[in-house]
Amino acid sequence: MAFLWIHVPISRIWYSNLRKCYIKMLYISYKFTIMKEVLIIMWIADGWKEYEVIDTSKGEKLERWGDYLLVRPDPQVIWDTPRKNRGWKHMNGHYHRSSRGGGEWEFFDLPHQWELHYKDLTFNLKPFSFKHTGLFPEQAVNWDWFGEKIRNAGRPIKVLNLFAYTGGATLAAAAAGASVTHVDASKGMVNWAKENAAASGLSGAPIRWLVDDCVKFVEREIRRGNHYDAIIMDPPSYGRGPKGEIWKIEDAIHPLIKLCTKILSDDPLFFLVNSYTTGLAPAVLTYMLATELKPWKGSVESQEIGLPVTESGLVLPCGASGRWCSSR
């Protein structure tokens, strides 16, 4: 297996036993994973040292989170490959999906909480409902991307992080030198993000922590006349607000992107949208960002994001990201 960085002008990419595919962008940088007759084009979060997807099989993935092994369900894993790795029989935690919906954890010598590090960032992990641990490791590929943009901007950058969860993107942006407004509707998630900031040595960083409805917050920022140089959003596929409001990403994502353009500064740096909904293909993210950010000079690229799988040497898809970046 080989990893290649390829900078491609307008052209066709050809590979044996694969159909030709057109790339309709002026210039694109992609990471290619090539294994014999397999060509995978996606953004891969392969900078982890303490996290690893060891294997995938029968609707589940075997992961290493620091010193501990977890088995969790994954809807992308539709293949039934042999489970040869001994970790399948020696896990520290196993999330069992219920036929009635949801599920529950089964633990084997797993602490209530432990730490995981990515470069200079530290995250507090603790398994909780809906199979989660408090971190989405695949997002590291985006942290690296916008962290470099912020560090090379040569000016102060003001970032808005919507649906900010436990703060992975917030901490990555703050560590790169940005001032960040972190917004999430869950008080528990915001407090967890604050704990991660403290563990990462970023307690004194210019981060504004807000428990709020993201759409309503943006609407108020428009009325206040506040603006941001960069926007990050990681909306859920489905959600319900405290007053019964229903969020469906297919219906709400485009209006929210459009709304957010009203709080962009005159010289925005980037706009990042993440999606874990299979119906929102990368091309859909590209279309929305390209149309709504047309007044600003920039380029758009979208792609699946993924995590390398040790046993197979392939990549587990983990959603998609759309990136708009200033061309100035």
Where do the language-model regions lie?
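Conserved SAM-binding motif I beta-strand of class I
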Residues: 179-184
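Non-catalytic substrate-recognition/targeting regions of SAM-dependent transferases
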Residues: 48-64, 70-137, 144
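Conserved class I S-adenosyl-L-methionine
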Residues: 156-162
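C-terminal catalytic and target-recognition region of SAM-dependent MTase-like enzymes
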Residues: 268-328
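Conserved SAM-binding loop of SAM-dependent methyltransferases across substrates and taxa
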Residues: 166-178
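Mobile active-site "lid"/loop adjacent to the S-adenosyl-L-methionine
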Residues: 186-189, 211-215, 228-259
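S-adenosyl-L-methionine
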Residues: 190-230
